[in-house]
């Protein structure tokens, strides 16, 4: 899809936990919180607090009030999107809940762009979050169990990223334009190892990237970088091989947010970072400002 009147990104903000702040991108985040519970009683409440912090920082950076937001496109990893529901209730704006797992920020930005380009509003907020402890509790093993993590496993990021999207750049201060996008399909190679999500996601990433290049009649060299959310080290290796089999070489310009946000050697994060907050925080703090 191509947007005839490309929406623009006015501002972006990021809030992360202490481990993320100690990683390679630590200096770029707007706020690094040392308390893993963000002053709250539960992991879920912590994530809600983190998401609201990111949203409010983005709104302030854009020079807007919450009342000017026509829509919120937001999501997290928890059941019923409870981090989003309880976190953004204070904004008192219409919400579209988005559950795209690790692709949530990309999906939210695309949906926001479609709404604004279609004339449904002037401003939208795309925000997502994840929390290591909340994700482990819901999807993997209780933290006190102390299970062994294979090297193919990723580490769920404690982080949130928020992006303000506008129908037009009235002040000439936009960070970027969203000129178009390619929604991905569900591609299943039958990988059943929940501790190797990079291998599970790589085929879909390959399909989306190659379809995008075909749709827009472009080559990888037309882009400064081709960025994925959290394939991690193993997923990246699979992606590069699959893309090459389809006639494209992206090895010299592919970046993965999960590989950028942590140092796997010093931080023991194995294959890299993951979760809704991984791509969102990395995009907001490191990629968009650059």
What do the PLM-derived regions correspond to, one by one?
Residues 37, 41-44, 49-57:
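N-terminal, Lys/Arg-enriched amphipathic/low-complexity engagement segments
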């Amino acid at each position: 899809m191509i947007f005839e009147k490309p929406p623009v990104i006015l501002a972006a903000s990021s809030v992360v936990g202490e481990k993320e702040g100690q990683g390679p991108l630590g200096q770029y985040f707007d706020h690094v919180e040392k308390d893993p519970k963000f002053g709250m009683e539960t992991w879920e409440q912590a994530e809600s607090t983190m998401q609201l912090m990111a949203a409010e920082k983005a709104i302030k950076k854009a020079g807007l009030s919450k009342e000017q937001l026509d829509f919120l496109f937001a999501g997290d990893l928890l059941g019923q999107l409870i981090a989003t529901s309880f976190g953004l209730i204070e904004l008192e704006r219409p919400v579209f809940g988005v559950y795209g797992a690790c692709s949530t920020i990309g999906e939210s930005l695309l949906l926001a762009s479609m709404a604004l380009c279609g004339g449904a509003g002037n401003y939208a907020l795309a925000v997502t979050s994840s929390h290591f402890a909340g994700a482990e509790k819901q999807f993997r093993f209780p933290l006190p169990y102390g299970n062994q993590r294979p090297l193919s496993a990723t580490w769920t990021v404690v982080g949130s990223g928020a992006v303000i999207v506008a129908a037009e750049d009235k002040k000439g201060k936009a960070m970027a334009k969203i000129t178009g996008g390619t929604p991905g399909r569900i591609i299943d190679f039958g990988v059943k190892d929940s501790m190797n999500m990079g291998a599970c996601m790589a085929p879909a990433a390959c399909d989306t990237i190659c379809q995008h290049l075909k749709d827009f009649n472009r080559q990888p060299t037309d882009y400064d970088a081709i960025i994925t959310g959290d394939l991690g080290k193993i997923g990246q290796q699979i992606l590069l091989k699959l893309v090459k089999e389809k006639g494209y070489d992206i090895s010299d310009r592919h970046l993965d947010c999960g590989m950028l946000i942590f140092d796997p050697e010093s931080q023991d994060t194995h294959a890299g970072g993951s979760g809704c907050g991984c791509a969102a925080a990395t995009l907001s703090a490191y990629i968009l400002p650059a």
